[in-house]
Amino acid sequence: IVGPLLARYGKGYIPKPGGDKIGRRRLDTHFIGFEKLGAKFVYDSKEEFYRVTAKQLKGVDIHLEEASVTGTANIIMTAVMAKGKTNIYNAACEPYLQQLCKMLNSMGAKITGVSSNLLHIEGVESLNGCNHRILPDMIEIGSFIGLAAITKSEITIKNVSYENLGLIPSVFSKLGIKMERQGDDIYIPAQESYEIQSFIDGSILTISDAPWPGFTPDLLSIILVVASQAKGSVLIHQKMFESRLFFVDKLIDMGAQIILCDPHRATVIGLNHHF
């Protein structure tokens, strides 16, 4: 929200976001980016309020400390109306960022390097409206794949934008879930059971999250629940957030066999639908 406000009105005020309970979600990437573009940032710790103002935004080279999806998006939406050229290094390049850049270009922005981690933005004075079809939600698609497997159901997920799913189909396949691409749809047949693969050397499969094109962290919770009903074992390694796996105690109370190794890792021993 703040990025577009800053670009259009020269100021943006927002209360401190509440966020969720998956771990620390620092906002430094956003505000450091705004400051480099010429904005002044003030945080009122008493009121827990963020204020960002700028008389004039100027293009600059920005090296992001982390490939933050929302941080990159906020900086892009600010830089498109800054004077001069902005280069964003270590930019997030998820499909959602790619479609944001494509939509902004349709509105009159000048962004090149789309789909890479180095974006070049030539500032423009104004943007126009456009028609844009948003991507399907890859988290919902992964959730439906898991839902089909865990309930032994047959489903077809329509219009998934398959080329933008990255590793999602292959990771679910490693859990033993059968699926078939049919054009831009995914067909999942009913399965009585599914068996987790191991690595080539026979060691336990590890599934971990990573920035795009790695496996999205938002689906690790789904993978963990699906694995609890499989045959075999898997190590889930949540690298990005330190509190995301703390829900496993609820699954253990329900009968799941899960060992929480540390805040970032859990070993799931599948019980083949026996709980």
Q: How should each PLM-predicted stretch be described?
A:
Residues 1-275:
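Short, structured segments at the rim of ligand-binding sites
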